Amino acid sequence: IIMTDFEKVKDFILDMGFAISHEDPKEELVVINDDERGIKNFVIDCEAPILILEQVIIPMPEDSSDFCRRLLQINRTLVHGAFVLDEEGTTLLFRDTLQLENLDRNELEGSIDALSLALAEYADELVTFARG
């Protein structure tokens, strides 16, 4: 039996112990949550040839140029992924992309762990900024 990329990704996620809170097989995406690890509505989307991993972090306040500079410095320390802005520049997201073709469980787990580590390390700073 040949598994689709979507089925493979779902298997990896379930194998890691995550609960899938939402699934859209047509769009080939799942949403996972793990409050203890700071994972909330984490979207994992198969967009061949890549897998997109994305989570909303905070809304961006109006004057955020200093914070954007700080985010670029933080990005330099991240093992995987990066803090990015949405197209409108109004929302801060964590985002990572992986190649689907030879994706393995360790690689996917590493990207998810990177989000948890980034939030553990920088959550206070992000919250302080979000409050203005």
Predicted regions and their residues:
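Short, internal acidic amphipathic alpha-helical interface segments
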Residues: 52-91, 97
